[in-house]
Amino acid sequence: MRHGCRVPELGRPADQRKALLRALTTQLIRHGQVKTTKARAKAVRSEVDRMITLAKDGSLAARRRALGYMYDKDLVHALFAQAKDRYGDRQGGYSRVVRTVRRRGDNAEMAIIELV
């Protein structure tokens, strides 16, 4: 039995799932929006919110945690520079998931996750 299933498994082993979420988080912060499956979009939403909350904190420890998670060092510095101005008055909910048409090959539910 799976009591307290907090993390969607996304059909992958733990190491591949963590790498996928890190890559999607990095790409979403870089480009502002990413088209992916609905399950992946919902899973990456909490990771993106966590990174933006760290950036709003702005401390050295928060910066080091973000550098340890995201793949692009320059992107982390840019996020920390603009997060307070862009998200200063918002208490969470930094991204939205918009459903789109299903994927043609396997009929998977697709979504666009974008930063607010």
UniProtKB/Swiss-Prot annotation:
Example GO molecular function term? structural constituent of ribosome
Matching InterPro entries, A to Z? Ribosomal_bL17, Ribosomal_bL17_sf
Per the record, the GO terms for biological process are: translation
Q: Which SUPFAM superfamilies match?
A: Prokaryotic ribosomal protein L17
Keywords carried by this UniProt record? Ribonucleoprotein, Ribosomal protein
Xref: Gene3D superfamilies: Ribosomal protein L17
A Pfam family reported for this protein in Swiss-Prot or TrEMBL: Ribosomal_L17
**Gene Ontology cellular component annotations, sorted alphabetically:** cytosolic large ribosomal subunit
NCBIfam families recorded for this chain? L17 (TIGR00059)
| Annotated HAMAP family | Ribosomal_bL17
Oligomeric state and interaction partners are given as: Part of the 50S ribosomal subunit. Contacts protein L32.
Annotated family = Belongs to the bacterial ribosomal protein bL17 family.
User: What is the name of the protein in this document?
Assistant: Large ribosomal subunit protein bL17
Write down the species. Picosynechococcus sp. (strain ATCC 27264 / PCC 7002 / PR-6)
